[in-house]
């Protein structure tokens, strides 16, 4: 049981991480690694500044806390600090992957799965092929001096196939991937990937340059997702706005940025690579509208950025790993569905371009 220092805010995040990386280059095994590591990130805040420490010795957490507290200035009114007031005090256990835990799958089975995809890269017209299997499982606990006590897990795995199409008018390098939250989700995807690779080869061999000009474009779901991520998601990460009046004016809430049917959301609730039921400050995930009916309506926040802009937390304080402090970053960002069909979108873009 940790003893949190008095008159200071503090929190501790402990992570157990397991990762697997397998790589085949032109069919030859080049990498086969499994790693397990356990570490923690400790924070202390006195109302003026943060004191941080990362350690791979979680049994020394009390010493880490005490060392950081000795550097800080005790603040009897720390509970009234605008940052501290925004911290949620959640107590929960969300262990979603006890069944289907990737750590329980032998590496031999993972390698056999990867090899089952290798024949897709052995067709004519492909060179410099690379097949990869990646997975990660994280078991994370978070506790704070305010009383937060959270345990959660997440995991994901994927197959990535990369290649260069030969014989094309110009070099064409591309790749296809499949993502899943458990090992079973990566099985049986060969035919879909085979068709996608054939589509790439056909494109590389027959594509012609686009005539310069202005076009109405219809974006595939993948491209639309990248568009939402890059054009709206990053600008909504509110740490970019601190100290920049230009960014605040450019991204002012209430500003119209699109058609009235456009809504873009961010949330850690949906299962996927952005799944994050609680962020790394213990804030519960929720749906946050970045754009609603074409109007900027929200931003993504940590407790510090929410306090600085006098807004509410959103569950987007995320750390790369236990070696890093949490910063404001997206979870899952997407464009909300509308009422148009694919065919009606194409009819409305006659003479335009479809971006697959």
Model regions and ranges:
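N-terminal small-residue-enriched
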Residues: 1-356
């Amino acid at each position: 049981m940790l003893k949190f220092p008095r008159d200071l805010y503090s929190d501790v995040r402990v992570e157990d991480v397991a990762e697997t990386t397998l790589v085949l280059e032109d069919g030859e095994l080049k990498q086969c690694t499994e790693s397990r590591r356990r570490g923690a990130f400790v924070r202390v805040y006195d109302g003026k500044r943060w004191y941080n420490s990362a350690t791979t010795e979680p049994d020394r957490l009390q010493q880490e806390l005490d060392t950081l507290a000795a550097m800080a200035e005790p603040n009897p009114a720390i509970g009234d600090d605008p940052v501290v007031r925004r911290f949620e005090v959640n107590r929960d256990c969300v262990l979603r992957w006890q069944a289907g835990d990737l750590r329980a799958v032998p590496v031999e089975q993972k390698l056999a799965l990867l090899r089952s995809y290798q024949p897709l890269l052995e067709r004519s017209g492909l060179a410099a092929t690379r097949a990869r299997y990646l997975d990660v499982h994280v078991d994370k606990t978070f506790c704070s001096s305010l009383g937060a006590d959270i345990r959660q897990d997440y995991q994901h795995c994927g197959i990535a196939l990369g290649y260069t199409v030969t014989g094309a008018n110009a070099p064409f390098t591309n790749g296809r991937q499949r993502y899943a939250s458990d090992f079973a989700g990566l099985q049986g995807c060969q035919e879909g990937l085979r068709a996608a690779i054939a589509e790439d080869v056909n494109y590389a061999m027959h594509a012609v340059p686009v005539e310069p000009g202005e076009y109405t474009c219809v974006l595939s779901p993948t491209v639309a997702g990248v568009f939402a991520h890059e054009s709206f998601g990053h600008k909504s990460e509110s740490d970019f706005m601190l100290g920049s009046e230009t960014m605040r004016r450019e991204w002012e809430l209430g500003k119209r940025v699109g058609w009235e049917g456009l809504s873009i959301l961010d949330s850690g609730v949906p299962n996927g690579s952005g799944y994050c039921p609680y962020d790394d400050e213990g804030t519960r995930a929720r749906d946050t509208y970045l754009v609603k009916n074409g109007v900027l309506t929200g931003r993504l926040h940590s407790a510090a950025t929410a306090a600085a802009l006098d807004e509410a937390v959103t569950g987007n304080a995320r750390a790369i790993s236990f070696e890093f402090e949490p910063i404001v970053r997206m979870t899952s960002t997407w464009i909300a569905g509308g009422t148009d069909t694919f065919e009606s979108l194409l009819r409305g873009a006659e003479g335009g371009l479809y971006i697959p």
